[in-house]
Swiss-Prot record:
Enzyme Commission designation: 6.1.1.10
Underlying gene: metG
Functional note: Is required not only for elongation of protein synthesis but also for the initiation of all mRNA translation through initiator tRNA(fMet) aminoacylation.
Binding of Zn(2+), residues: C143, C146, C156, C159
Cross-referenced Pfam families: Anticodon_3 (PF19303), tRNA-synt_1g (PF09334)
InterPro entries: aa-tRNA-synth_I_CS, Anticodon_Met, Met-tRNA_ligase_1, Met-tRNA_synth, Methionyl/Leucyl_tRNA_Synth, MetRS_core, MetRS_Zn, Rossmann-like_a/b/a_fold
Amino acids binding ATP: K336
Cofactor(s) named in the record: Zn(2+)
Claim: Ligase is one of the keywords in the record: yes
Protein's recorded name: Methionine--tRNA ligase
UniProt motif 'KMSKS' region: location: 333-337
């Protein structure tokens, strides 16, 4: 089985915030790390990259009188370093839409769609002040259906209806706030309507697409899919390859979606296995996982599969599109201008990255919008990590060193009590349950199994009380600690996708190396035998004490310093 994993491509005009991170990048990384243990490292490919074309970059470059690529070069390198070096994101390939492989692939792919492309004259919003054609999302106004005053030119976030800039009441340019004019211009349209029935059938038949994804995609289908313009009058982008389309570029959403394929091709070219990419995009032995925010559902659940179908090349359609709801910050939407939220270059200076990774997965908004609060974040660290997991590990390992000189005692199966067999069963089942949830993209729900096992372990110790058993029956105390030590190995493997360094630390304390070589399907087995020597015991997690005033003061200092080092585009 081949597993393709993708996180939505971050747009390079802003540093991602914590909501962006958990919506795509971090979630995809956690799943990819799990998948490598489950299916084997050679069978998993995890890709993404910087989305760098389109109007926002073009506008910024004009303001600064520089080439757009000068801005995106800096921003791409900044984001890449943050993801790979700071946040421990395990991409096989983190690329960019300015990659020559990507640009060539997009142009070639577009020509394969020509059967479903038609040329139409359309009225496009044009800002006379900024002297630029405006993409749908660069026009805002009032929704004609529900009256929502902040609707975008492509969709209303309040009622979910599809829109065009022409439909908006009182449309405004998002760049300057002025009313745009509508100019006639010729564009190339991808006929989505040709795939209305196929998309509907695919969605309804899927056993793995989440309900929130199905709901949004089917609402598009029920309204009737309409042709969508795949060209723009922007200069900064991939030139449209169609005859007569000189001066036009490919709409960024269409080309960014194709980046999932081009990034896979690029990865295998880098490692000298140029044909291997096909194993992750064709055939029945492939599963593909996309981690995105809910605002990107239509593009991944409608437009991407329609393009793949239209190519006529039997590309694998998405297996799971794991779309998160929104993460709020202390009850409010993230806002850079209003200083609401934490951005991914600020967060590492407030808490250890490993803690952040765990916190964000525990707060992952899988079914509804979720509120990040510092009180809850610190509770997760101090109670779930320190008390539930860390304390359990310390209790078990300390007793093995104290009572058995650091050697795992032998298990005597004939002396097992009901509590022992019950906990052994819980150890075996925990990684299976977590795997079932992860396979559906339910990472927060899956992470609950880690805590259940740690809490069950603490309860097991309290019930069996090996510190008392050791006084009269060393063999029975040995049974308890053998089982408990084996549960720590299980915990370390389950914790690894979320907290790779902490999991490796626990694994090392158990006397093992290279947790990445473990196999998920063996995670619940009692493989640690008698006389196995454990290593020195050290503190796995520490409690964090912070109050809101301290956090806000520290954030102000961090932001002042970052303003000096962030790339021009990201300030």
């Amino acid at each position: 089985m081949k597993i393709f994993v993708a996180s939505a491509w971050p747009y390079v005009n802003a540093v991602p915030h914590l909501g962006n991170l958990i919506g795509s990048v971090l979630s995809a990384d956690v799943f990819a790390r799990y998948a490598r243990l489950k299916y084997g490292q050679e069978n998993v490919v995890f890709v993404s990259g910087s989305d760098e074309h389109g109007t926002p970059i073009e506008v910024e470059a004009k303001k600064r009188n520089v080439n757009p690529k000068e801005l995106t070069d800096q921003a791409h390198e900044y984001d890449k370093k943050l993801f790979l070096d700071v946040w421990e994101i395990s991409y096989n390939n983190y690329t960019r839409t300015e990659s020559e492989i990507h640009k060539t692939f997009v142009r070639d792919f577009m020509l394969k769609l020509e059967k479903y492309i038609k040329i139409e004259e359309d009225e496009i919003p044009y800002c006379e002040y900024d002297k630029i054609y405006l993409p749908d999302r660069f026009v805002k106004g009032t929704c004609p259906y529900c009256g929502f005053e902040d609707a975008r030119g492509d969709q209303c976030d309040n009622c979910g209806r599809l829109l065009t800039p022409r439909l908006l009441v009182n449309p405004k340019c998002v760049l300057c706030g002025r009313t745009p004019v509508f100019k006639k211009t010729k564009h190339w349209f991808f006929d989505l309507s040709a795939f209305n029935d196929k998309i509907e059938e695919w969605i309804k038949n899927s056993q793995t697409l989440p309900e929130n994804v199905k709901s949004v995609a089917l609402s598009w289908v029920k309204e009737g899919l309409k042709p969508r313009s795949i060209t723009r009058d922007n200069a900064w982008g991939i030139p449209a390859p169609f005859e007569g389309a000189e001066g036009k570029t490919i709409y960024v959403w269409f080309e960014a979606l194709l980046g999932y394929i081009s990034a896979t091709i690029e990865y295998f070219k880098k490692i000298g296995k140029e044909e291997e990419w096909k194993k992750f995009w064709f055939g029945n032995d492939v599963k593909s996982y996309y981690f995105i925010g809910k605002d990107n559902i239509p593009f991944h659940a409608v437009i991407l599969p329609a393009m793949l179908m239209a190519s006529g090349e039997n590309y694998v359609l998405p297996t799971v599109i794991a779309a998160t709801e929104y993460l709020l910050y202390e009850g409010q939407k993230f806002s850079k201008s209003r200083k609401i939220g934490v951005w991914i270059d600020e967060a590492p200076q407030l808490l250890d990255i490993e803690y952040w990774r765990f916190i964000l997965i525990r707060l992952r908004p899988e079914e509804r919008d979720t509120n990040f609060t510092w009180r809850e974040a610190l509770r997760i660290v101090n109670t779930e990590l320190n008390d539930d997991i860390g304390n359990y590990a310390n209790r078990v390992l300390s007793m093995v060193r104290r009572y058995f000189n650091g050697e795992v005692p032998q298990i005597k199966y004939e002396k097992l009590k009901d509590e022992d067999t019950k906990f052994i069963s819980e150890i075996k089942e925990a990684p299976k349950k977590m795997s079932e949830l992860f396979e559906l993209g339910k990472l927060k729900a899956g992470s609950e199994e880690i805590l259940k096992l740690a809490r069950n372990g603490n309860s097991y110790l309290n019930i069996r009380a090996p510190w008392n058993l050791i006084k009269n029956d060393k063999e029975e105390a040995g049974n308890v600690l053998n089982i408990a030590v084996n549960s720590l190995r299980t915990l370390s493997i389950m914790l690894y996708p979320l907290m790779p360094k902490s999991a490796e630390k626990l694994y090392n304390m158990l006397g093992f190396k290279d947790i990445e070589r473990e196999k998920w399907d063996l995670a619940g087995e009692l493989v640690i035998k008698s006389n196995h020597k454990i290593n020195e015991v050290s503190v796995l997690f520490k409690k964090v004490e912070l109050n809101e005033n301290d956090i806000n003061k520290k954030l102000d200092e961090i932001r002042k310093n970052l303003e000096k080092i962030r790339p021009t585009l990201l300030r």
